[in-house]
């Protein structure tokens, strides 16, 4: 063996590096076990804090460098944030209102929503259509782009400046998000910009148990503003006039709505604000218990028809508070106060904004305040903004209530003093991200630059708000377009199931190798497997990549790849021994002859793994990472390390009589001469019929698409008692109603086999950007299940807590926005096609014959069609989920990567025999090559199926669908290598397959 020194050096370096990085995990375990001995939780945390920064490698270093666990193993939260590129463009254009710009923005938004694409390009194309003959510089020669764009700039120069500014906004947003998460104290977060998806940032936060706090913190743009205000009595007459004009049909759009007003109090206040006649007619008094509910709804509808605004908005409140309204009426009120008629009636310098939280004395009723802000600047912006804040702290006021105290810079302090001096006796509204957090009365001039945000806050609220303000302002609004939340208890169960499946699969592989190849070769292969796992974990830790359940599956599958390499080598050694060579020569020839097949099969798998890594997100990337590492490491351990050991032993005259077979495998597929090629008519007919059945099933039954492809929300709910999915579907029928009155689609499927776990899917308000919709959806789900006596939790908060299992709870949730769903769909199609094209080209380059490329690609396409077809035929008929999601697409690509191994091994043997017998009968040569590799095919497929069956049975629900797809792929991939790929390659070579006689095929001469 050549280059032994390099192999030894690499092995030693890998060993030392793996020991170094894995040692951090052992150190963390030691500190945690010492802390666990302390009973008092506060003292326990004090101990961890005391050692947090001690030593060269402190406890904090160990935490940050140990093996990270993904969400499915540790619990936590995964989100994809989308930075609003349209908002960036509007800021760069200084919020222009001319028709060309506004129409172009509207058209670009519509095109992006319908088809996706680069928003900047969509806008520029739309602008040229809506404003022909006008240059982009007319819109973007603004203060924001001063020095980059002038009125004389060409469109190309403006586009370059816009793209640079958009990228700067995304980069700044990324930094702000990272700072906020660091301040929140998340250990080992994974934050990355998604390549090829402009404006999207993926954030993985293991261990997070309060998703509501994280949603608010991540989506808050920290756009802090200080506004002067109107007094409520100044605005009330305008609102009364607006109400009258809307009721009289002034705008021609307001329709009669049967939505009931929130409370009797609101209606009484409306009456007070109206003339006596209206009061007598529309004041709705409290009914006695016998009153009909239908009659009450009719009166409410009549009141709303007569007073569209004031039947929903209770006037009064004092200072800047012009009125109160139930949260369910705010959408209808917004439609009125932002309507065209409102622009004509209300003062032009008036802005109406809602409070961030319900009013203190009306919190239980979910009543919000409407504040009247006064625009005092020519630009329409607030006179004082958050860029003047130098520090923010969460504190307590004199009454012991949580508040946020802020300090301003010199310029901010000067403006703050002027502003408070000019508004003594009035309120100044403190607005954050478009909602009013507080509007305190100004009692006198405030100098020194101090200010305070108070309100109906909890300690967590003020802490998060202070951290958000200190982290800086987001350059553009961000919203969560995809989200997954996993409870820690579910993560612990996943760890247990993952470890069990891994250990059982590993033990079975070791037993299988010894059973098939005898003790010494079998244990050598097993030693290579152990080293493989050790190196894989070490490299994974050094990359600071999180270990997920799909990642664990990738590691287990890489063991199958490692076994395949050992099987190829051992089968070659057995051939050389049967030809009469000595042990040294047989081992050398076995390793040498198997190298090309191992190299090609591993490289094609690697190509698929890289495609998975670059196109996938979340769990798919976790799987791809460990699989890629496993492929590289298994190649090194199987081809080089085991060779070192054999050479060492044989050079010292040991293992000279080593056996590479057992009574079980001695005659396995030896001397077989099956006539595979002449079966092509039968096998092609079966394949075509199967393809027709599968395609027909796509049209008749379709596929069970997950929210990854449709958009929506998933909630995995665990009940105390077994329930039927049909029962859940009936209970939730009509519960989720969108804002436009349409019913949201709702589904339910069973997860696992205990009958207590159901996954609920709905597309409720999935188009909405409101951060409150997530909470609303969970509340609707809780109320519907509670009403049906399916859950017994006393509050929605307990129902949403994944650790409170008794009484039923949500143990995990997922959200996928419609734009992400479209991108996932296109990404899935492109990734599969790209994988097939990449493998086609590689086979063409390596085998220098298009016939092998065509044969392998057709067979791979059939493999993928078969797996998808079975999912179409079987969904709803088997006791586990067969939804088409991102994980399934990962499985398809993995099937492609694994299946090509079989094809490459067979084609490699055909290529070798073509060189050895250039004048031999081609058909017999093809048959002989397939027969010669049958033992390898059976051993590799069996060992891989052992691994996959362990994952399928023991690995848990989250990985069961993936392993089922892989099982189908291994079975049909093996068959297609023999019955489709080889005959197809032969036919493309221009050969006609002959009908062979009944006797066995003669050996190739």
Which role does the model predict for each range below?
Residues 1-21, 26-67, 90-128, 156, ...:
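Interfacial helix-loop-helix hairpins and adjacent transmembrane helices
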Residues 2-4, 404-405, 409-424, 428-429, ...:
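Interfacial segments of transmembrane alpha-helices in multi-pass membrane proteins
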Residues 12-15, 522-544, 555-562, 623-638, ...:
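Small-residue-enriched core segments of transmembrane alpha-helices in multipass membrane transport
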Residues 22-31, 49, 65-77, 81-433, ...:
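Non-transmembrane, solvent-exposed regions of membrane trafficking/translocation machinery
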Residues 177, 489-509, 561, 581-617, ...:
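Pore- and gate-forming transmembrane helices of large, multi-pass membrane proteins
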Residues 204, 448-452, 460-507, 780, ...:
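Juxtamembrane "pre-transmembrane" interface segments
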Residues 531, 538-539, 575-596, 600-687, ...:
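Hydrophobic alpha-helical transmembrane segments of membrane transport and translocation systems
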Residues 560-604, 647-655, 872, 878-940, ...:
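Cytosolic juxtamembrane regions of multi-pass inner-membrane proteins
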């Amino acid at each position: 063996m050549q280059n032994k020194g390099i192999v030894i050096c690499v092995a030693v370096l890998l060993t030392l590096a793996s020991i170094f990085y894995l040692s951090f995990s052992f150190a963390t375990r030691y500190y945690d076990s010492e802390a666990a001995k302390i009973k008092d939780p506060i003292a326990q945390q004090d101990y961890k804090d005391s050692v947090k920064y001690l030593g060269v490698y402190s406890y904090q270093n160990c935490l940050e460098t140990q093996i990270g666990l993904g969400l499915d193993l540790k619990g936590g939260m995964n989100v994809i944030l989308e930075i609003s590129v349209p908002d960036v463009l509007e800021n760069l254009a200084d919020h222009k209102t001319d028709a060309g710009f506004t129409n172009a923005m509207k058209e670009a938004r519509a095109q992006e929503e319908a088809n996706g694409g680069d928003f900047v390009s969509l806008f520029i194309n739309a602008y040229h259509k809506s404003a022909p003959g006008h240059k982009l510089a007319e819109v973007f020669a603004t203060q924001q782009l001063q020095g980059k764009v002038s009125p004389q700039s060409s469109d190309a120069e403006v586009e370059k400046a816009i793209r640079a500014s958009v990228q700067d906004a995304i980069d700044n947003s990324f930094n702000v998000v990272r700072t906020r998460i660091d301040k929140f104290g998340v250990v080992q977060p994974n934050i990355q910009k998604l390549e090829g998806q402009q404006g999207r940032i993926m954030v993985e936060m293991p261990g997070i148990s309060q998703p509501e706090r994280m949603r608010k913190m991540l989506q808050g743009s920290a756009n802090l503003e200080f506004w002067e205000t109107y007094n409520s009595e100044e605005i009330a007459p305008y609102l009364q006039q607006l109400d009258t004009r809307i009721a009289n049909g002034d705008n021609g759009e307001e329709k009669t709505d049967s939505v009931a007003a929130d409370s009797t109090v609101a209606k009484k206040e409306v009456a007070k604000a109206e003339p006596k006649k209206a009061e007598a007619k529309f004041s709705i008094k409290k009914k006695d218990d016998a009153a009909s509910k239908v009659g009450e709804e009719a009166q409410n509808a009549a009141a709303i028809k007569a007073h569209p605004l004031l039947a929903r908005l209770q006037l009064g409140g004092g200072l800047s508070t012009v009125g109160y309204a139930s949260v369910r009426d705010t959408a209808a009120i917004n439609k009125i106060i932002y309507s065209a008629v409102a622009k004509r009636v209300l003062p032009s310098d008036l802005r109406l904004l809602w409070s961030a939280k319900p009013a203190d004395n009306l919190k239980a009723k979910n009543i919000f305040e409407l504040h009247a802000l006064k625009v005092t600047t020519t630009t329409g912006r607030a006179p004082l903004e958050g860029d003047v804040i130098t520090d923010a702290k969460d504190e307590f006021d004199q009454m012991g209530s949580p508040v946020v105290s802020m300090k301003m810079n010199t310029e901010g302090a000067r403006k703050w003093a002027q502003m408070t001096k000019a508004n003594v006796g009035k309120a100044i509204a403190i607005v954050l991200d478009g909602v009013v957090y507080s509007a305190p009365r100004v009692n006198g001039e405030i100098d020194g630059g101090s200010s305070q945000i108070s309100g109906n806050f909890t300690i967590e609220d003020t802490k998060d708000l202070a951290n958000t303000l200190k982290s800086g302002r987001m350059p553009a609004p961000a919203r969560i377009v995809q989200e997954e939340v996993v409870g820690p208890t579910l993560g612990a169960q996943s760890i247990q199931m993952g470890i069990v499946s891994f250990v059982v699969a590993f033990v079975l592989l070791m037993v299988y190798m010894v059973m098939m190849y005898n003790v010494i070769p079998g244990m050598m292969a097993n030693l290579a497997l152990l080293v493989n796992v050790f190196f894989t974990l070490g490299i994974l830790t050094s990359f600071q990549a999180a270990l997920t359940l799909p990642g664990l599956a990738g590691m287990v599958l890489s063991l199958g790849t490692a076994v395949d390499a050992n099987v190829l080598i051992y089968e070659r050694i057995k051939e050389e021994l049967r030809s009469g060579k000595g042990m040294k020569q047989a081992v050398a020839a076995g390793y040498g002859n198997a190298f090309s097949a191992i190299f090609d099969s591993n490289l094609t798998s690697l190509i698929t793994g890289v495609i998975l890594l670059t196109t996938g997100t979340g769990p798919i990337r976790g799987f791809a990472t460990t699989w890629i590492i496993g492929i590289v490491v298994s190649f090194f351990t199987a081809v080089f390390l085991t060779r070192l050991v054999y050479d060492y032993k044989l050079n010292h005259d040991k293992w000279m009589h080593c056996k590479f077979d057992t009574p079980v495998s001695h005659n396995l597929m030896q001397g077989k001469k099956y006539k595979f090629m002449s079966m092509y008519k039968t096998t092609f007919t079966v394949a075509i019929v199967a393809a027709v059945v599968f395609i027909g099933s796509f049209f008749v039954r379709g596929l069970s698409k997950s929210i990854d492809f449709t958009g929506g929300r998933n909630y995995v709910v665990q009940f105390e008692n077994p329930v039927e999915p049909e029962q859940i579907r009936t209970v939730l029928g009509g519960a989720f109603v969108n804002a436009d009155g349409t019913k949201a689609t709702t589904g339910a499927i069973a997860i696992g086999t205990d009958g207590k776990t159901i996954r609920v899917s709905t597309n409720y308000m999935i188009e909405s950007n409101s951060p409150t919709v997530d909470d609303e959806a969970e509340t609707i789900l809780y109320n519907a299940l509670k009403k049906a006596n399916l859950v017994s939790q006393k509050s929605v908060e307990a129902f949403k807590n994944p650790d409170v299992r008794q009484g039923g709870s949500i143990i995990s949730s997922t959200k996928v926005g419609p734009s992400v769903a479209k991108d996932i769909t296109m990404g899935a199609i492109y990734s599969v096609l790209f994988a097939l094209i990449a493998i086609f080209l590689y086979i063409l380059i390596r085998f220098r014959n298009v016939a092998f490329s065509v044969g392998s690609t057709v067979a791979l396409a059939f493999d993928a069609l078969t797996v998808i077809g079975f999912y179409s035929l079987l969904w709803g008929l088997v006791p586990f989920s067969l939804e088409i999601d991102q994980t399934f697409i990962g499985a398809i690509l993995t099937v492609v990567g694994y299946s090509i191994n079989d094809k490459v091994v067979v084609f490699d043997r055909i290529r070798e025999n073509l060189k050895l017998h250039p004048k031999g009968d081609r058909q017999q040569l093809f048959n002989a090559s397939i027969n010669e590799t049958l033992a390898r095919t059976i051993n590799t497929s069996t060992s891989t199926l052992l691994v996959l069956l362990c994952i399928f049975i023991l690995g848990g629900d989250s990985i069961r669908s993936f392993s089922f797809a892989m099982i189908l792929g291994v079975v049909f991939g093996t068959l297609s290598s023999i019955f489709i790929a080889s005959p197809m390659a032969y036919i493309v070579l221009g050969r006609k397959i002959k009908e062979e006689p009944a006797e066995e095929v003669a050996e190739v001469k």
